[in-house]
Curated annotation (Swiss-Prot):
Domain named FAD-binding PCMH-type: residues: 34-199
Pathway entry: Cell wall biogenesis; peptidoglycan biosynthesis
Subcellular location as annotated: Cytoplasm
Protein's job: Cell wall formation.
GO molecular function, one term: FAD binding
Similarity annotation: Belongs to the MurB family.
EC number: 1.3.1.98
Protein name (record): UDP-N-acetylenolpyruvoylglucosamine reductase
Amino acid sequence: MSFPDITPDLKAAMPELRGRLLGNEPLAPLTWFRVGGPAQVLFTPADEDDLGYFLSRLPAEIPVMCLGLGSNLIVRDGGLPGVAIRLSPRGFGEHRVEGEVVHAGAAALDKRVAETAAAAQLGGLEFYYGIPGSIGGALRMNAGANGRETKDVLIDATAYDRSGTRKLFDNAAMQFSYRHSGADPALIFTSARLRGTPATPDHIRAKMNEVQAHRELAQPIREKTGGSTFKNPPGQSAWRLIDAAGCRGLKIGGAQVSEMHCNFLINTGEATAADIETLGETVRARVKAQSGVELQWEIKRIGVAAGQS
């Protein structure tokens, strides 16, 4: 299944583009679930200037989606119309410390940012050690773990709007709430400044070890999974509601509710995106019927179903 190839026209309109532009590029290898169709266009910018140039020249009617690390994402089987942007570690992966401030590019792994802070004897960012994503995704969804979240440490973030204009957002402008940012969905975040707190190496390492031990004991980290599937309802745990509804181990096609942690869906090997999304919706329906609680997706679902591209 493929889309009309618009890359020749885009390249002709952007003679100074330095990044990589590919048509009908498979996205499944770029997501942790390893499912989904192609992007009509996949663009990997060389750096911030290249990203701004691309957006400023891209026709306004062409939709744009930034993929992030692909750890909390389902790309539907029909693929993604328009442009998918993937920020590379080479151009957007910096992580360095100045005083008590950690500078992190959007493509920097959350775990690496925690390690960089720890090396500078800065605490407060240990929770990132257990999050399987990048800083760009953390900004977009206010990623958190172990009682801490991005809103607790963010100073400000840099982003580009759909016209290619560079903008700076302080913490308040991000409009953070639980696993959500109210910032314009069209923004593409490129970097952030995070506030650390001086702490002893032993204290920081103990917290990071605790985070890692919890992940290994409680989460199916060696499976093809997208992380936590549903947001925790206020005062409740999504996994408990899912378990109470009898969904532990539930299967649809090649998708399964994890036996280890009910709020994780896994690709057992041959799942389609439709299998995973259908399983998630089945879980939501059973939980609603059993407890009256309507679970909200934490995993982002993008693209079109098979046959719709």
